[in-house]
A protein has these predicted regions:
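Small-residue-rich helix-loop
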Residues: 38-39
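Low-complexity, serine/threonine/proline-enriched polar segments
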Residues: 42-43, 53
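Non-catalytic alpha/beta scaffold blocks inside enzyme catalytic domains
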Residues: 1-27, 34, 48-168
Length: 168
């Protein structure tokens, strides 16, 4: 793409080809994304099985444990002692569990049923910072641009800082 004079034409051609294939079969265009292609893996699993990545394959069938990632059940069964909540867009009241420690990274105007142990306010993607928004099935993405200047860090900045602390 870097050396192409018209990268939009390439994307348009790929999209047209996928539409043509979908007349008689099933096809999708999925990006190779994430540091270890984790976004690609999730999209492919959703496309092929209808389930997210947490699938166990057994011969010609598969098993999906829908409770393995159920945060409410994990907290209720005391399988964790810490929850990290990330919510940069929605500032509605967040229900935190008082039986565990809670770290909240998110919208500066967020409200809570109880005070989080740590609250890190961050900017909104597409308003305060550039970013990418994925449709809930992870198949479609939209590039978000920054439209205002604000002193808040992005969620990515916070995560990068936390990963650097871990490497000390």
């Amino acid at each position: 793409f870097d050396k192409c004079n018209d990268p939009d034409y390439i994307i348009s051609s790929i999209s047209d080809f996928i539409l043509l294939l979908n007349k008689n079969s099933r096809a999708a265009c999925m990006p190779i994304a994430g540091s270890l292609a984790d976004a690609t893996s999730s999209q492919t699993m959703s496309w092929i099985t209808g389930f997210p990545s947490r699938v166990k394959f057994n011969g010609k069938s598969f098993f999906h444990d829908r409770s393995i990632c159920d945060s409410q059940e994990i907290i209720r069964n005391r399988n964790t002692d810490l929850a990290i909540h990330i919510s940069t867009v929605n500032h509605n009241k967040v229900e935190l569990n008082d039986k565990i420690k809670n770290i909240f990274i998110g919208h500066i105007n967020s409200t809570f049923n109880i005070k989080p142990d740590i609250f890190i306010p961050v900017g909104n993607p597409g308003i305060d910072h550039r970013g990418i928004m994925f449709r809930t099935d992870n198949v479609v993405s939209v590039l978000l641009d920054k439209i205002r200047e604000i002193e808040l860090l992005s969620t990515q900045d916070v995560m990068n800082m936390l990963s650097e602390v871990d490497n000390l």
